[in-house]
Amino acid sequence: MTSITRRVGIYFALLQLFFTLAWTVYIIFLPRLAAEAGIPKSWILWILIADQLVFVIADWLMGAKADRMSRIVGQLGPRLALITLFSALAFLLLPFAAPLASPLLFLVLTFLWTVTSSALRAPPLMLIGKYAGAGAQPVIAGLWLFGFGIAGAIAPYLTGVLRDADARLPFALASIAVAVTAWALAWAERHLATATAPVAEPSARKPLPIAAFLVIVALTALGFQVHFSLSSAPQYLRFVPAADLGQLMPVFWVGFNLAMLPLTYLIRRHGDFKVLAAGAAVGALAVAYATQAGSLGLLIAAQLSAGAAWAAVMFGAFGAAILLGRSGREGYATGGMFSMFAFAAMLRILMIATQLNQDTGLQQALAWLPAACWAAAALLLVMLLRRRHTAVG
């Protein structure tokens, strides 16, 4: 690993860490700020659903736009940084606008922050795929995911620490961190474009259509959303009191982060699609076992395995999206992938808003839904890859 690759990778890890923590701060304080703005509590989940719907649309559009902006080296980074400054400003103003008791102003700022923050979802990954060489790409992508995993592990602790804090300081710190980090996007783009070897042109035929890939991503993302957000806490509560959940929920993300280093090697050796398929298959087994683990120790082992499997799925999916989009459509493919992540999150919140997760007749089905989704994704991917191999052979 060269020093430039290491520095750019650490930069992307920090960018993802700060961005994900900003979203965590938003989730923690949204109910209180919305109440101050005069918005009924019953609207909270629907605001979050609307946020994810905005991501579904904006992520794909922003990714496609990034493809066009990146045709001239050095043009994309500064523009993304400028958009992020507007995003950080809207985010910063949320706790100051809430006491004005204007629901419209609060919702407008929320919308502005959500739609502009799409600049930090697909486009940075597109930069990695467009400019990073074959050797550097897994390292940088792995560090990018490591930042995401660290934020996921910290989130439960932040929820407890910040629950009763003044919202203005966390919002200010998060806004400044995101804005300052994003401002260096031009530096990252320039170094990626000049310090790494040119990316080889792909073969004329892709391993599978982008549409099929997005179906696979949607299945794995829905499995993750239901498992981590709806199933994990009830599984732990079979063995521990609710007060211990803050220490146990990060176990999934510990497995996620521990998998990063070996996955960097596995991606290089076996390729993105095989790692994605293996991650989905292992994840299906892990989450299925978690539903019937007979002790806390076995449940922790299952959660660690599920976290490592989700890391393999995301790592493989990121590389697969870049490969399917090359050359010239990396942003379109990665934007579509992030749209599917947002779509799955929207479905999960919709389940909660409509109380489907409380329906006793559906709870058993929901418990097995993550395993079914991940197994279906693995099976579909293997079938498509075999069909491609047979056609080529």
Where are these regions (language model features)?
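A membrane-interface helix-boundary motif in multi-pass transporters
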Residues: 160-177, 353-375
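Helix-to-loop junctions at the C-terminal end of transmembrane segments
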Residues: 57-74, 163, 259-272
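Intracellular juxtamembrane helix-capping segments at the cytosolic ends
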Residues: 119-132, 312-326
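Glycine-rich segments within core transmembrane alpha-helices of 12-TM secondary carriers
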Residues: 138-157, 338-349
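Helix-loop boundary and gating motifs at the non-cytosolic
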Residues: 1-55, 212, 216, 221-238
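Hydrophobic core of transmembrane alpha-helices in multi-pass small-molecule transporters
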Residues: 90-97, 101-120, 298-312
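A late C-terminal transmembrane helix in Major Facilitator Superfamily
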Residues: 327-359
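Structural signature of the two symmetry-related core transmembrane helices
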Residues: 76-93, 274-289
